[in-house]
Amino acid sequence: MSKADYKKKFVPGALMVPKTLKKSMAFKAAQNFEAPKELILTGYCTPADDQGDKPWCAAYAAANYAENLLWRKRGYKKEIDPAPLYQYAKTIDGDPDADGTYLECTLQALLKYGYFDSKVSKVKTIGGGLFGNLNAANDVKYAIHKYGVVMAGFNITDEWYKPSAKGVIVGKEGAKPQGGHAILLVGFDENGFIIQNSWGGDYAHEGFVYITNKAFNEQFMYAAFLTRALDGMY
């Protein structure tokens, strides 16, 4: 697909970003945490979804999030419909008439529908530079290492519509900001992070794209995930 075709899949503003993050949800890496050189969880990802022109990127990220963790926990694939997640999120996000929603509201939807135990799992968030956190990449790596895949929002650029031939978002100079977009972070290495997007299986490498540390640090807004969602998996 062309750059213009992928641009049609992006709905500006479809990811809502809170002005402040609740202190009760704030998450930081442990002081003694040293990230492994590589941690990749793509083996538990279901095939890439295609959100089309629907402003549901956060709900698709939440569905992919649950699919990944439940496959790890229960040992089988289960594809989850993002529509009910989006619909419930819109009842609690405070702006029912606007397109898009917050990451944390879609996680609340997963708890509402019983995918994870709400008595055990709690929603946590990690702010990026937008919230004054200059160590966000390490915090995100710690969350992936400790709790599994992580939902994240980026202020994407038009480079996302056509990554490099190797499927990499490098953070090109002069790339034009497009607005917020939600994805799933499914791994990392020393040079960047692996993303599962919701723009179909033809995007980048079968729906997955790699973002360099440079681009991550420039574009990352915030992340959200559940603690202890995998409790009992062993």
Residue ranges and their predicted role:
Residues 1-234:
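Catalytic-core signature of thiol
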